[in-house]
Amino acid sequence: MMAMNTETLSLIKQSIKTIPNYPKEGILFRDVTSLLENAAAYKATIDLLVEHYRGQGFTKIVGTEARGFLFGAPLALELGVGFVPVRKPGKLPRATISQSYELEYGHDSLEIHTDAINPNDKVLVVDDLLATGGTIEATVKLIRQLGGEVKHAAFVISLPDLGGEARLTALGLELVKLCEFEGE
């Protein structure tokens, strides 16, 4: 985790509600919408990310559908750079490219506009939660296919026991996680 004000990080972590047995039995769901409902915690989340990434030369912020939009877009505004949404198939109106990724039972895919990332754009990927890393791996592949440089990813929540951190560092990404929930 990044070195930050522990009081602020505690506010953020405490604002995330844990819902047992959702969406199915045995799962502890980390509900980031409760953080969004707490204006102080939401602002603190964006402020910490801005403080960490300001001056690092990013030209685009990419957020993954759908909760990555809620953190990526305000971060992009504060950094003065464009925001690019990565969406599920059929949701973007212009020409797109697609990348499939594996789920626990089956597969899914993500799309990005072909003109959203320019060659040599320096890109930061943002999402609410890092679990297995499959969504972000697919997102990184899309960005790199368009010629963008992506070496950084930021998350509000990380679930390190699910293997996503190792998967993404193997792709050469430097990860920032505001809070972790281990062993759950």
UniProtKB/Swiss-Prot annotation:
It comes from the Bacteria. It is an enzyme of class 2 (transferase). One of its GO terms (biological process) is purine ribonucleoside salvage. InterPro entries: Ade_phspho_trans, PRibTrfase_dom, PRTase-like, UPRTase/APRTase. Keywords: Cytoplasm, Glycosyltransferase, Purine salvage, Transferase. It catalyses: AMP + diphosphate = 5-phospho-alpha-D-ribose 1-diphosphate + adenine. GO terms for cellular component: cytoplasm. Its EC number is 2.4.2.7. PROSITE patterns: PUR_PYR_PR_TRANSFER. Its main location: cytoplasm. It is found in: Cytoplasm. Pathway: Purine metabolism; AMP biosynthesis via salvage pathway; AMP from adenine: step 1/1. GO terms for molecular function: adenine binding; adenine phosphoribosyltransferase activity; AMP binding. HAMAP family: Aden_phosphoribosyltr. Homodimer. Belongs to the purine/pyrimidine phosphoribosyltransferase family. NCBIfam families: apt (TIGR01090), PRK02304.1-1 (NF002632), PRK02304.1-3 (NF002634), PRK02304.1-5 (NF002636). Catalyzes a salvage reaction resulting in the formation of AMP, that is energically less costly than de novo synthesis. This is Adenine phosphoribosyltransferase. It comes from Shewanella baltica (strain OS155 / ATCC BAA-1091). The lineage of its organism: Bacteria, Pseudomonadati, Pseudomonadota, Gammaproteobacteria, Alteromonadales. The gene is apt.
